[in-house]
Amino acid sequence: TSPLPPDPHMCSSDEEQTRSPLSLYSEYQRMDIELRSPHAMPASHWHGQVEINVPFDGDVEYLINNEVVQIKQGHITLFWACTPHQLTRPGSCQSMAIFNLPMHLFLSWPLDRELINHVTHGMVIKSLASQQLSTFEVQRWQQELNNPNEQIRQLAIDEIGLMLKRFSLSGWQPILVNKTSR
């Protein structure tokens, strides 16, 4: 498979001039969901959203802030994507959900304060339980976020917020602690 085209809303470590992920905040307010085969990235990148990754059929490996992070099949993992990150090993995974949530939306949801603090301080968080989400839900949310009916779009956003509420209540743990926050 060919690499993904450059995204104007993301920064990459192979750019000649670096940009702050916060400078991208005003450019991109929509929630984005992908369901696809993960690809190894040639360089790390960063952006202003909260990223959620769910590999459905195999483990994947990231380099996040120069630390190796394993994301296990079926587990939900989230982090603030202003931290440089790079998918280094897609393994045998053929189907992975990648959510990019605008930070203002993430902060508006009634989630565990400790979870929010960990994410906003650069930690990577994973669910203790697997299989909290299916590809069926991800595909439905993808379609509904592009629906012309604003109420349908809002319903998808509300359901994603509830998915994170379930994540928050079902048990989670930091798997990468920001070195600067210790």
Language model: regions and residue ranges:
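Histidine-centered metal-chelating micro-motifs
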Residues: D59-E61, T77, A81-L87, F106
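Generic protein-terminus/edge-of-domain signal
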Residues: T1-L63, E67-Q70
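All-alpha amphipathic helical-bundle segments outside canonical DNA-binding/catalytic cores
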Residues: N146-L162
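Short acidic-glycine-tyrosine-enriched beta hairpin
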Residues: N66-W80
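Tight coil/turn sites that cap or link beta-strands
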Residues: P38-H39, Q73-G74, C82-P84
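DNA-binding recognition helix and immediately preceding turn/loop
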Residues: V177-R182
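A hydrophobic/aromatic-rich effector-binding and dimerization subdomain
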Residues: T1-M31, P84-P148, K165-I175
